[in-house]
Amino acid sequence: MAWYGLALSTAYGARTEDPGPADGSVSGGTDNLAVPLAVAAVVLAVAAFTWARRRWRTTTRTTPAVTVWGGPHPGAAEPGLSPALDARSRADLVDTDDAVRTSEEELGFAVARHGEAAAAPFTEAVAYARAELATAFRSRQRLDDTLPEDEAEGRRVLDGIIRRCADANARLDAVSGDFDRLRALEREAPEAVAGAESAFRALLDRVPAAEAALDAMRERYAPSAYAPVAGSIGEAQDRLVFATSSLNQARQAVDAGRHPEAAVRLRAAEGAVTQARVLVDGVERRAAELAEAAERLPDALTGAETDLTDAGALLKGSADDVPGGVARAEEVLGEVRAGTVSGPYDPMDALHEVVEAGAALDGVLAGIRGPERGDGRTRALLEQSSLTARSALGAATDFVGTHRGAVGDQARTRLAEAGRHWERARELSAADDPRGALPEARRAEALAVRALDLAERDVRAYQERRGPGDPGIGGGVGGAVLGGIVLGGVFGEGADGHGGELGGGLGTGGFPGGPGSFGGGATRGRRGGGV
C-alpha cells in the first residue's frame, strides 16, 4: 500500500505546498521514474484484482439460478421461473443499470462543457433508457413479491425484462458515436485534462471539511447515525489516489501528443473524481440531515404524544386490538424520549420511530377527529417522513453508485422501487393529498433501507470471495474496480463477466481494463474519445 501514501501525499502537496506548474498537472511536476513505477503498480494491481474478481464470478454469476452477480440466491429457481432465463434477466438488469449510470455521468460532463441544447439528443436517449430500465426493475420486483402462476407466465415476464434491457442498451449504443463527436476528447484533450485537474483540486480542498464533519458526527451521535458514511472519507481518498495517477498519465499523454490515450486516462480520472465527490457530498448531506432530524424531533415527539393522549381518551372501551396498538405506540415514544437524554443517540432513527408511531395513531384517530385537524397532523407526519425517506434513499443511491462493481440485482431492484415510491409521494404531496403521500414515503424509506442492506451484503461477499491469498490492491485501483470505473481486465473478461470485447490491454502501456463510456452494452467499453 506504499503507493497509496505516495499518491495521496502528492495530491495533498499540490494543494497545500505548491500550486504546481503552469501546465496544470496534478502532481506539481512529474518525476521521470515515479510515473513509470506508478503505471507498473497499477497494471500489477489490476491483474491481481481482476484475477480474484474473475474467480469470484466463475463461482457465482456463471451458475444460473444458484448464485448470480451480487450475492446468493436460492439453490434452485423459484417455481414458475426458468433457471437460465432468470439468471440472464438478473445479469441484464445489473449490466444495463451500469450502462445507464455511466452514461448519465458522461452526459453531465458533456452538458457542463457544451450546454444542454447540444446535449439534448443524448439527454433524451438516457431518459428513454432509464424509463425502460425502471419498467424492467418494476417487473423484477413483482416477480420477487408474487410468484408467477406457471412457467409460461414466468417466461413472459423474464422475456419482458430482457427485452426492456436490450432496448435501453440499443438506444444508448445508437447515439454513442455522435456523443463521442460532441465530447471530442481526443481533439480537445488538453482543455479537457485541464478542466478535470481543476475539478480534482476543488474537490481535494473539500475533503478536510468533510472529514471534520464526520468526526463531529462521531462525537455527537450514536454509531448508527453516521454508519452510512462512516467509510466515505477513506473511500473518497482512495478514488482521489486513482484520479491522481490517471490525471498525471493523461497529462503526460497530452504532452507527448498521444491524445487517444489521454482520452482514456481522462475518462478514468473523471469517473474517479465523480465518485469521490458523491462520497464527500454524502458526508456533508448526512451531517445536515442529522442536524435537521434532531431539530425536528422535539416537535415530532410532542405531536405524537398529543395523539397518544387523544387516543387514550377517545378509545376507552374499544376493541382490544386498538388499545393494544396505542400501548405499543406509548412504549415506542417513551423509549425515544428516554434515549434522547441518556447519551448520544441517532436522531434519524428516533424520528423514524416517532413517525411510525404517529402514523399508527393517525390511522386510529382518522375517523374520529375532524378533517382539518386530521389533515394537518398527517401533513406534519409527511414532512417528518419525507426527511427520513429522503435520507435513506440518498444513502442507498450513493452506496450502490459508488460500489456498483459488486452490487447485484436485488439491491438495485429495491432501490429502483424506492425511487418510484418516493416520486409518487412527491406527486401526491404536490397534489395536496398528504394521506396518499404518507404511505408512499414510508414505503420508499423501507425499500431504500433494504436496498442499502442488500448492497452492503453484496460488497461484503465480494470482498470475502477475493480470498485470503489476495495480495491487495494499490493505487486506488481496487476502489476503481469496485466502483465500476474500470471495466474488464487482463484476462479479456468483459464487463458482463462472460468475456469479450471490453477486456484486454490498451496496447499503449496502460491499465488493462479501460473506463466505461457513454453507451449500452455494445459500445460502453470502447477506447476512443472522439476526434
Question: What function would you assign to each model-found segment?
Answer:
Residues 1-531:
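Long, charged/polar, soluble alpha-helical segments
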